[in-house]
Amino acid sequence: MTGVAVQTIDHVTVAAPSELEDAVIEWYSQVLGFERLAKPEGTSSSGAWFRAGNVQLHVTIEPAPPARVGHFGVVVDDLDGAVEQLRAAGSGIEPARTIPGRRRCYTRDPAGNTIEILSYDGVTDA
């Protein structure tokens, strides 16, 4: 094997402006159901850290609007149920191009960061 021997992804970071800090933290905790973690000593008091499975999500608070490039994806067992819950929470759903063997769509957190929601149970989109 060539290159760096990466073992896994440890965390993904998304940014939010300070005026949306509470809304973004609540969204990841209440809407997506991520487990909120205690932040290590020496890190910023703003923002929050979460865990979903073996990967962490770090929310940082930035003075400028966050970049709208890229996204991260989360796997769910029931895409239709997840879409229903996201819509009930007021989150928009954007369709995604079909990829064989998976169903998927996109949503955004209150700061506009894009999250792909996917399941490996079919080939049609939400």
Model regions: which residues?
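Vicinal oxygen chelate
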Residues: 1-7, 9-18, 48, 62-87, 89-126, ...
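Residue-level structural signal for beta-strand termini and adjacent loop
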Residues: 42, 62-63, 120
